[in-house]
Amino acid sequence: MLYFDWFDLPVSLYPDTSLLKQRFLSKSKLFHPDKFTLASEEEQAKALESSGFNNQAYKVLSDVDARIQYILDEYGLLKDDKEAMPPDFLMKMMVFNEAISDLEDDPSSFSTLQNDLVEWEHELKAELDYCASLLPLDKENARQLKTYFFKRKYYLRIQDNFSKFAQP
């Protein structure tokens, strides 16, 4: 069963979070293991399984990155964990990595690089918003979402490197 189906929500990059939480809490009460202490072992096991599924579904759908990965996986698009990235994007990565390593020698560029990362994050958000408008996914739209997903992974890695090496 799809996590979205579990909560009776449409597949979306931006599900209604208040409705998601409400349905999660409702199912949490319904399948709480304490309610099944006097039930048969089979019913207890089923309640425990349902409770675990409920928790996992909520955890995934509550986090945008996990949700995107889940959607792509459900569409069968992450079987090949490699994505050919556009050359201009790879060049951008190289420039960011070089700029981060240069911070040790030239800390004055910290704020410029920080601003560039914020701008990049805004670009990624706009790209995600565009991808959200494409659901349900066809082959071309799915490819765009997959490209976004891998760009986001690169971005998070760059941001992590920046935070490690770039203390003002």
Language model regions located:
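C-terminal accessory/regulatory regions appended to core domains
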Residues: 1-168
